[in-house]
Structure formats: C-alpha cells, structure tokens
C-alpha cells in the first residue's frame, strides 16, 4: 500500500499500525482490483463506496484513486481528498454535503472531483494543481488584513 506509506507523515505514529491492518485484510486484493476498475471507468462514487479496508480512510483511499486513474486528461480524473483539502474548502465556504445534496460520502467525493475540475478549468489551471494548493493552504485562506501590504 504505497499510498499509505506516501501519505502517513512523520508525526502521528499511526501509519505502521494502519498499514499493517490494511495489508492483513483479506479483502485487500479484491478491493484494489474492483476500485481500480471503477476509477478507470469513471465511477468515482462507486469506487469510494467499494473501498472498505481495515485501517484505511478517505485520505488514503482517494490517494489510491488518484494513483490508478490513468484516463485521458480530458476526463474528470480522481483527486485526493484529505483533511487539509477539506479545511481549505470549508474555509472558503464550500461544503461537500451541501454541494452534493446528501451526506453520503461516495456522492460527496464525486461532487468534489467534478467541482474541482470545473473550478480549475475556469481558472486556467489543472485540477491536481488546485488540489495541491488547497492541501498546502490547509485552511489558511484569508487574504491580507486591512493595512497589510499584500506583496
């Protein structure tokens, strides 16, 4: 599970335990196979719904989706959705459950991906660059305060 090693960070110490839980889960081969197929067919909601493994949550399952999505760039390719990206989106006033019209995470994830690709297109950037920016900001999206130089 390279995406778990990639995204575990160095501060919380839970990465090895969660990675071991995922690697020990008997469902692992089938989950990786079926979710890869769902992602490659453009069914991101279905992939999200099917990705159930011990020790793996949204941040890592969506990293898997982004890693295996090799569709043409014209498609709304899978993006990573982790807590840092969510902090930034929420700080900007965007709510996945309101945008999706449901609290069901598979639909919310697909709505997030679609929204990000739409915003990226209108801004003239790629969706993965926009995702990186939101990750980097981690919710710190305030502009300059009154009286501060913005340069």
Model-derived segments and spans:
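A near-ubiquitous, low-amplitude feature marking generic local secondary-structure context
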Residues: 44-48, 68, 99
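Helix-hairpin-helix/helix-loop-helix acidic hairpins
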Residues: 1-56
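C-terminal accessory module of base-excision DNA glycosylases/AP lyases that mediates lesion recognition
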Residues: 59-62, 69-151
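Short, hydrophobic/amphipathic alpha-helical patches that form generic packing surfaces
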Residues: 1-13, 63-67, 131-135
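Alpha-helix boundary/capping residues
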Residues: 35-39, 68, 92
């Amino acid at each position: 599970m390279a995406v778990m090693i990639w995204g575990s960070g160095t501060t919380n110490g839970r990465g090895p335990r969660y990675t071991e839980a995922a690697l020990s889960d008997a469902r692992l081969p089938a989950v990786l196979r079926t979710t890869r197929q769902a992602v490659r067919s453009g069914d991101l909601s279905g992939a999200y719904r099917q990705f159930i493994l011990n020790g793996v949550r949204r941040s890592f399952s969506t990293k898997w989706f982004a890693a295996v999505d090799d569709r043409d760039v014209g498609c709304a390719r899978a993006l990573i959705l982790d807590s840092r990206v969510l902090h930034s989106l929420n700080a900007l006033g965007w709510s996945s459950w309101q945008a999706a019209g449901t609290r069901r995470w598979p639909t919310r994830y697909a709505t997030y991906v679609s929204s990000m690709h739409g915003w990226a297109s209108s801004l003239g950037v790629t969706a993965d660059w926009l995702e990186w920016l939101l990750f980097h900001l981690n919710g710190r999206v305030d502009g300059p305060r009154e009286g501060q130089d913005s340069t």
